[in-house]
Amino acid sequence: MRTFAIGDIHGGLKALIQVLNKLEIKEGDKLIFMGDYVDGWSESAQVVQFLIDVSQKFKCVFIKGNHDVWCQDWLKTATVNASWYMHGGKETMESYEGFSEEEKKQHLVFFEKLPLYHIDAENRLFLHAGFTSLHGVEKEPFKELFYTDRSLWEMLLVMDNRIEKDSMYYPKRIQHYKEIYIGHTPTTKYNESLPINIANVWNIDTGAAFKGK
């Protein structure tokens, strides 16, 4: 069985289809999507429907991202968050034109069921953004940090790579897991179009919202 982690999609349906075609998914493979399915490109609603359909054929895990929280709130209450509207929400709302109320309800259920993180059988952690508890995600007191935190990644960016894992200076919160996979902060921010690996953490948000990668 193969496991594939797929970073932030942000309404990029065509790019998503290209990725899955290249992977040549087989029965028994596992797809882990890292959140932020909407807001960015013009086909957010279509991405959500596509993911729902894919989950009927393959084993999928869908993590919740901060943009998914915004879209969920809009689908549930029709309230438009001003920050969301300015950061892709407008395009997402437009993508839902032509979708029936029943289809929108189906998408709301999809968003409401999204887990905040996933730990697989190999003790690999998958979550959208980060966490702050030194005792691991199970002890995180502020659940919204799973899809908003950047302190984990920013800590790693300035970490001295000479620090050994058994050192007292090695970050305690990343010691709990074999590997950690996150999105949320585009690697293009650091002039890199590929995933970035620091210590046992992989940032796989390669900027699909901006450059479609």
Regions found by a protein language model. Give the residues of each.
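Active-site neighborhood of divalent metal-dependent phosphoester bond hydrolases
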Residues: 40-122, 132, 140, 147-158
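Conserved beta-sheet core of the metallophosphoesterase superfamily
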Residues: 164-213
